[in-house]
Amino acid sequence: MEENEYSGYWEPPRKRCCCARRGTQLMLVGLLSTAMWAGLLALLLLWHWETEKNLKQLGDTAIQNVSHVTKDLQKFQSNQLAQKSQVVQMSQNLQELQAEQKQMKAQDSRLSQNLTGLQEDLRNAQSQNSKLSQNLNRLQDDLVNIKSLGLNEKRTASDSLEKLQEEVAKLWIEILISKGTACNICPKNWLHFQQKCYYFGKGSKQWIQARFACSDLQGRLVSIHSQKEQDFLMQHINKKDSWIGLQDLNMEGEFVWSDGSPVGYSNWNPGEPNNGGQGEDCVMMRGSGQWNDAFCRSYLDAWVCEQLATCEISAPLASVTPTRPTPKSEP
């Protein structure tokens, strides 16, 4: 009886102890939650600060980039205007040369008509005395000389026009390259090197046949102007004797390249050119790479052509692109 009363007397203090523990646990949970929220808020504030800092840096960088791009654009526009002015001036010069060529053609036509008339007069006068015949013969010789002079002037004008067209094409390529355009497009089976394309022909040909073969391919026999170009050719001729575009057909000893330029760089074989046996007026490049004058009617198994490389041109520039000059005819 007393034990039961004792046990019932201490029961309430145990319940109060449990309530105190639960309160402490709840307080710890609340403090932990508060600490977690405070940490999360601190992380959010740090992220916001870093993001704002990065956005500011990006904005400053963008402003600098826009400023640089604006300056570059202004410089490009200024250069473009200057280049357009040069192209217009060269086009005007080309038109003037074309007009002069037309005038020379008209003069040549008149000279031909005059010559025809005079030849008819000479035929009618052949029955006259020998003195008149001699005078007429002299007159005929004079007229032939006049016609020859007219043809020479016409050819000189034509050569000048071809050179100008090629210079315009080269200048246009330089303009495109300065704008970042790639000028390295070559026809199939041609090799590119330093803004030109090269074709290494095979088959037995005389020099004149090799020249015509290059012309049929819209090119001409190669003109060599530097040691680098010589080295490039040596890598591809496979040690075969090859025709190149050098000759002195017009005047012995005065060699001229197929592009009309005189000889600057040379790689003659020792003792060459020697015109051995007389009539060695065309130049070949031996398998060793050294040059030798040879008979133009000799047959070689290889020959080298060249032409200017073309450029990758965007649509706005394509409308003003000059045409490639036709290969210059050789004497």
Curated annotation (Swiss-Prot):
Gene Ontology CC entries for this record: external side of plasma membrane; extracellular region
GO molecular function, one term: IgE binding
Stretches assigned to the Cytoplasmic side: 1-23
Positions of Sequence repeats: 71-91, 92-112, 113-133
Keyword Nucleus: no
UniProt-annotated location(s): Cell membrane; Secreted
Sugar attachment sites: 65, 114, 319
This protein's UniProt keywords: Calcium, Cell membrane, Disulfide bond, Glycoprotein, IgE-binding protein, Lectin, Lipoprotein, Membrane, Metal-binding, Palmitate, Proteoglycan, Receptor, Repeat, Secreted, Signal-anchor, Transmembrane, Transmembrane helix
CDD domains: CLECT_DC-SIGN_like (cd03590)
Membrane protein topology class: Single-pass type II membrane protein; Lipid-anchor
Post-translational modification: N- and O-glycosylated.
Coiled coil: none
InterPro entries, A to Z: C-type_lectin-like, C-type_lectin-like/link_sf, C-type_lectin/snaclec_domain, C-type_lectin_CS, CD209-like_CTLD, CTDL_fold
Keyword Secreted assigned: yes
Occurrences of domain C-type lectin (ranges): 185-298
Cystine bridges: 183-311, 186-197, 214-305, 282-296
Annotated binding of Ca(2+), by residue: 272, 292-293
Domain of life: Eukaryota
Residues on Extracellular side: 50-331
Any one GO BP annotation for this protein: macrophage activation
Residues passing through the membrane, by range: 24-49
Lipidation (S-palmitoyl cysteine): 17-18
Function: Low-affinity receptor for immunoglobulin E (IgE) and CR2/CD21. Has essential roles in the regulation of IgE production and in the differentiation of B cells. On B cells, initiates IgE-dependent antigen uptake and presentation to T cells. On macrophages, upon IgE binding and antigen cross-linking induces intracellular killing of parasites through activation of L-Arginine-nitric oxide pathway.
Subunit structure: Homotrimer. Interacts (via C-type lectin domain) with IGHE (via CH3 region); this interaction regulates IgE homeostasis. Interacts (via C-terminus) with CR2/CD21 (via Sushi domain 1 and 2).
The name this protein goes by in its record: Low affinity immunoglobulin epsilon Fc receptor
Source organism: Mus musculus (Mouse)
